[in-house]
UniProtKB/Swiss-Prot annotation:
UniProt KW keywords: Sporulation, Toxin, Virulence
Database matches in Pfam families: Endotoxin_C (PF03944), Endotoxin_M (PF00555), Endotoxin_N (PF03945)
Any one biological process term the GO annotation gives: symbiont-mediated killing of host cell
Domain of life: Bacteria
Stated role: Promotes colloidosmotic lysis by binding to the midgut epithelial cells of insects.
Leftover remarks: Toxic segment of the protein is located in the N-terminus.
Membership in a protein family: Belongs to the delta endotoxin family.
Keyword Aminoacyl-tRNA synthetase: no
Coiled coil: none
GO molecular function term, any single one: signaling receptor binding
Protein name: Pesticidal crystal protein Cry1Ic
Keyword Cytoplasm recorded: no
Length: 719
């Protein structure tokens, strides 16, 4: 990690001011003299002015920027917005200069310490260049047509180029999943898959105005559903494989493991989370989505400050084991919370009056879920003689940390610690930004600056960082050894807001992990990789928890509720607002007992009866009932859909009838079409499942029987 301003921060230098910063508390620092080191040793130290965490801020910024841009355009955008999105992505993934795709490859290669084969690299880069050139041509034609949508020739050109480009993606995606190279190619695969799904969405958005027939639109939509499932499965599978390959026993292996976990989350899994929201039948208007997952930046500790003393690197200095570090700093699944106060307890490492280090030795954190009770946790040494330092975090987004990894020496025994941290913060709703710092004095051997923005850069570079930041600090962990105290920061994406605000003119997705409490029998469990965060589970009947929501007027606006769930059993979902029941309905099992959670085990279904909120702030509750203990019911998120854009029950029924009929040939109503796949039948089954029991109970049962018949024929055909 390169120092951002070597002239401003003199690092590991003899007879120089330590970290001279324009703050009153540091104006009168005394000079430092290195003890027990000759000039040759000093020269070797001062050559190392960087920490090498295998991180390229520009690489990560590309992933963060694309995910952030897409989060802001979910739903059905205007044609002009689509053209603008393609323009942005082309600029990010095919910029002038060095290939961004090569940078992606090199980034993962550095983390996993393995090179992609020459053939796989060259094949991928060649195919990516072809896709980029073809996408640029399509984008240019799309812009021309958007400017004159009545021009039949322009429409014909766009249609032909669209069909050719979509086929090209189908043909080229396998180049980014070459056997044996799936892990290092994963960011490339995810970005290309994302582009393919965005392209498939175009068919549904433009519909017949783009010159496509109803049959063609249906074909592209079915492919979108199929590829969403396949691409999600691939990304989650190879992320898990990559993590398993890096799991080992010592602190150094934990560093690589954590970097891979963080960077693949940012470059791959954040995209996977939004794949389902490209479905224009389910999300026909603007949709607000949130990422509640946490990522962990590098431990704050010196890395390779002196080649003569290997143990001056924190993870070589009798640091805890891989599993001990993981247990100490990685939080167990929990409800989303926000920091309110940090109390820091310090330790003193002293060799002499001119060589010492006051360092962060432990802390107490106070945090709170949205509308919930205060939680307190402690780590490290909290019983010290040095007065603690308290920093207030309430209602502030701490978007950046600048941390000094310090080093002190007792003869040849290094001590690693953190003598100073600058916290940069902003009020989320106000144009007010400032900072706080922890610093009690340091005169050790030297420091290395670690800036969180090198690992979690802002979404854009055209605004001040306090406006365009991508993440907020959510938790602080501590790696504690006999001679090591290293901080690890946890961060959440800024899309996970503090208010759970439901808008009257958009679909609002709220992860259930944003509840303010858990009901007895409910648990937060680790997300399966494609949900954007943790999920909730019940193994016996009862409520999951309660979510505090804020409502933007008008209060006359009515909504319908949907949920993304997986279950090993048939069950009933019940919902209520402020204790008053609003919905109750029967829903089917989506998976078998013992089956792993994956994309196909989750369904998004909802209730047909609309409701409205009467208060600006309300408590929404959902529970799972009428099932046998020992089964498993999971919920990822709740969706509030304005009733005007929800498919009316009658339209839903007609659509379901059409889809069921379309499974069979026109000449033989009981003959299954040869191109019908398993996922087609599942898709139709889900559509029938969502029909209103109140209005179409008998018709729903009849359609289910037909779908079961289609499933039976399909199974027999495959046998």
């Amino acid at each position: 990690m390169k120092l951002k301003n070597p002239d401003k921060h003199q690092t590991l230098s003899s007879n120089a001011k330590v970290d001279k910063i324009a703050t009153d508390s540091l104006k009168n620092e005394t000079d430092i003299e290195l003890k027990n080191m000759n000039n040759e040793d000093y020269l070797r130290m001062s050559e190392h002015e960087s920490i090498d965490p295998f991180v390229s801020a520009s690489t990560i910024q590309t992933g963060i920027g694309i995910a952030g841009k897409i989060l802001g355009t979910l739903g059905v955008p205007f044609p002009g917005q689509i053209a603008s999105l393609y323009s942005f992505i082309l600029g990010e993934l095919w910029p002038k200069g060095k290939s961004q795709w090569e940078i992606f490859m090199e980034h993962v290669e550095a983390i996993i310490n393995r090179k992609i084969s020459t053939y796989a690299r060259n094949k991928a880069l060649t195919d990516l260049k072809g896709l980029g050139d073809a996408l640029a041509v399509y984008h240019e034609s799309l812009e021309s047509w958007v400017g004159n949508r009545n021009n039949t020739r322009a429409r014909s050109v766009v249609k032909n180029q669209y069909i050719a480009l979509e086929l090209m993606f189908v043909q080229k995606l396998p180049s980014f999943a070459v056997s044996g190279e799936e892990v290092p190619l994963l960011p490339i695969y995810a970005q290309a898959a994302n582009l393919h799904l965005l392209l498939l969405r175009d068919a549904s958005i433009f519909e017949k105005n783009g010159g496509l027939s109803a049959s063609e639109i249906s074909t592209f939509y079915n492919r979108q559903v199929e590829r969403t499932r396949d691409y999600s499965y691939h990304c989650v599978k190879w992320n898990n494989t990559g993590l398993n390959n890096l799991r080992a026993t010592n602190g150094q292996s934990w560093v690589r493991y954590n970097q891979f976990r963080k960077d693949i989350e940012l470059m791959v899994l954040d995209l996977v989370r939004v794949f389902p929201s490209y479905d224009t039948l389910v999300y026909p208007i603007k949709t607000t989505s949130q990422l509640t997952r946490e990522v962990y930046t590098d431990a704050i500790g010196t890395v390779d400050p002196n080649q003569a003393l290997r143990s001056t690197t924190w993870y070589n200095n009798n640091a805890p084991s891989f599993s001990a570090i993981e247990a100490a700093v990685i939080r167990s699944p929990h409800l989303l919370d926000f920091l309110e106060k940090v109390t820091i307890y310090s330790l003193l490492s002293r060799w002499s009056n001119t060589q010492y280090m006051n360092m962060w030795g432990g802390h107490r954190l106070e945090s709170r879920p949205i509308g919930g009770a205060l939680n307190t946790s402690t780590q490290g040494s909290t019983n010290t003689s040095i007065n603690p330092v308290t920093l207030q975090f309430t209602s502030r987004d701490f978007y950046r940390t600048e941390s000094w990894a310090g080093l002190n020496l007792f003869l040849t025994q290094p001590v690693n610690g953190v003598p100073r941290v600058d916290f940069h913060w902003k009020f989320p709703t106000l144009p007010i930004a400032s900072d706080n710092f922890y610093y009690l004095g340091y005169a050790g051997v030297g420091t290395q600056l670690q800036d969180s923005e090198n690992e979690l850069p802002p979404e854009t570079t055209g605004q001040p960082n306090y406006e365009s930041y991508s993440h907020r600090l959510s938790h602080i962990g501590l790696i504690s050894g006999s001679h090591v105290k290293a901080l690890v920061y946890s961060w959440t994406h800024r899309s996970a807001d503090r208010t759970n605000t439901i808008e009257p003119n958009s679909i609002t997705q709220i992860p259930l992990v944003k509840a303010f409490n858990l009901s007895s029998g409910a648990a937060v469990v680790r997300g399966p990789g494609f949900t954007g965060g943790h999920i909730l589970r019940r193994t016996k009947s009862g409520t999951f928890g309660h979510i505090r929501v804020n409502i933007n007027p008008p209060f006359a606006q009515r909504y319908r509720v949907r949920m993304s769930y997986a279950s090993t059993t048939d069950l009933q979902f019940h919902t209520s607002i402020n204790g008053k029941a609003i919905n109750q309905g029967n829903f089917s099992a989506t998976m078998n007992r013992g089956e792993d959670l994956d994309y196909k085990t989750f369904r998004t279904v909802g209730f047909t009866t609309p409701f409205s909120f009467s208060d600006v702030q309300s408590t929404f509750t959902i529970g799972a009932w009428n099932f046998s203990s020992g089964n498993e019911v999971y919920i990822g998120r709740i969706e509030f859909v304005p009733v005007e854009v929800t498919y009316e029950a009658e339209y839903d029924f007609e659509k379901a009838q059409e889809k069921v009929t379309a499974l069979f040939t026109s000449t033989n109503p009981r003959g299954l079409k040869t191109d019908v796949k398993d996922y087609h039948i599942d898709q139709v089954s889900n559509l029938v499942e969502s029909l209103s029991d109140e209005l179409y109970l008998d018709e729903k049962r009849e359609l289910f029987e037909i779908v079961k018949y289609a499933k039976q024929i399909h199974i027999e055909r495959n046998m």
